[in-house]
Amino acid sequence: MGPAEAGRRGAASPVPPPLVRVAPSLFLGSARAAGAEEQLARAGVTLCVNVSRQQPGPRAPGVAELRVPVFDDPAEDLLAHLEPTCAAMEAAVRAGGACLVYCKNGRSRSAAVCTAYLMRHRGLSLAKAFQMVKSARPVAEPNPGFWSQLQKYEEALQAQSCLQGEPPALGLGPEA
């Protein structure tokens, strides 16, 4: 389903909840979720990944923020941020916390980062990782530029699996 169909479908269906559970310790949502202190506490969220340049950070005490400063624009370089962002998310999970990844609408940027995390730290293919994200949040639809970058990230992760302990060569620009 393309962005146009998703938009029409989203208009006909109720507004999605501010945050949804994608996997154990991984939540995806809109900017409203960062302000939902009770829900963040119930979910055990200790790290909010704010995938935006303009949305406010979390207001809940004890919740750290990692800002990934990108607009929802296919030309934005999200790929350069994926490896450090996924590493920070995994560190929060290993420390016993949970992560909320959000952007303005919880649709493109945050869905792309959740998909990348599932690929990097759960060993899923791009197709399987995105299926998990889409099942949890049906409005999820990374823009075409982010989807292309997720494909490059998957290729880098596949190449890395042959070289144990080597991080993928990322962040070298759009050609990476």
Swiss-Prot record:
One of its GO terms (biological process) is dephosphorylation. Optimum pH is 6.0. The active site is at 103 (phosphocysteine intermediate). It catalyses: O-phospho-L-tyrosyl-[protein] + H2O = L-tyrosyl-[protein] + phosphate; O-phospho-L-seryl-[protein] + H2O = L-seryl-[protein] + phosphate; O-phospho-L-threonyl-[protein] + H2O = L-threonyl-[protein] + phosphate. Pfam families: DSPc (PF00782). Keywords: Hydrolase, Protein phosphatase. Changing residue 103 to S: Loss of catalytic activity. It is an enzyme of class 3 (hydrolase). GO terms for molecular function: phosphatase activity; protein serine/threonine phosphatase activity; protein tyrosine phosphatase activity. Its EC number is 3.1.3.16, 3.1.3.48. The keyword Membrane does not apply. Residues 17-159 form the Tyrosine-protein phosphatase domain. Monomer. Has phosphatase activity with the synthetic substrate 6,8-difluoro-4-methylumbelliferyl phosphate (in vitro). Has almost no detectable activity with phosphotyrosine, even less activity with phosphothreonine and displays complete lack of activity with phosphoserine. The poor activity with phosphotyrosine may be due to steric hindrance by bulky amino acid sidechains that obstruct access to the active site. Belongs to the protein-tyrosine phosphatase family. Non-receptor class dual specificity subfamily. PANTHER family: DUAL SPECIFICITY PHOSPHATASE 28, IP21249P. This is Dual specificity phosphatase 28.
